[in-house]
Amino acid sequence: MNHYIRAIGSMLILVYSMLIAFLFIDKVFVNIIFFQGMFYTQIFGIPVFLFLNLLIVLLCIIVGSVLAYKINQQNDWIISQIERSIEGQTVGINDQNIELYTETIDIYHTLVPLNQELHRLRMKTQNLTNENYNINDVKVKKIIEDERQRLARELHDSVSQQLFAASMMLSAIKESKLEPPLNQQIPILEKMVQDSQLEMRALLLHLRPIGLKDKSLGEGIKDLVIDLQKKVPMKVVHEIQDFEVPKGIEDHLFRITQEAISNTLRHSNGTKVTVELFNQEDYLLLRIQDNGKGFNVDEKFEQSYGLKNMRERALEIGATFHIVSLPDSGTRIEVKAPLNKEENSSGD
């Protein structure tokens, strides 16, 4: 449409420019009677001057339409050849389109670098976005970790110490002879303080988890269990097989163990928790089991951040995560992680 309008406009401008110049020459220099008569002579009842104008406009429309059609054909051919070239198809050449083909190739060679540069800039923008996201993610994790450490220190230095002091005071009061009903309230208070201390230790374990550092997974779990045996009234036992665990999954499995024990201490109301780690040739089995009150897994899972976090850690290392719990029958968590024997043997 644009080519059509431009062609007609160009023809009209050209013809009318010639006509005005011709009339100007006649008026100033020649003043021929023939041109004066153009304003008075009629054709089909129309003055000759007006008739000629209509004829010129009609001719310009016809000629401009033909030119615009040919230009559009050429442009369509050029676009089709560019598309064929981009798709790797053969471009047809003959005597009529050799010039257009040359123009097409020139345009193609101009567009290819521009397209490559556009793709490069698009990928660079995407990479910058990903890098910015990763940087922000690292910063957020660092802020969260620092805040967890701060909360753990405050809990340990204030609430934990106060609970310990309350426990010592209750023990001293218990040694003295109290009249009923005060002597009957002391055991209740002791139980409340012990439960609070247990909750506090579970929170500290959750907020400030112990890292493996240079220890193996088995050694880390053993040390964790031994440390808890000294601090919590619940019986904590372990059965750990000594075998090499890939370094890439050790930390995740250790964090899962900590999270599971923390949840057990806080919510199970049980008297015993067992941690087991076995080598099953193609995979390892990590099991944490307690004899507590249990719960409805479907209802609890959607509300528990700890359970979701354990499952996410398991999925990150390609492991399966299963949890079985029944009311008054305890809870069992099992994680099965594949062992890459080829990597382990090559590492030896």
Swiss-Prot record:
It is a multi-pass membrane protein. The chain crosses the membrane at residues 13-33, 43-63. It is found in: Cell membrane. GO terms for molecular function: ATP binding; phosphorelay sensor kinase activity; protein dimerization activity. Residues 150-341 form the Histidine kinase domain. One of its GO terms (cellular component) is plasma membrane. This is Sensor protein VraS.
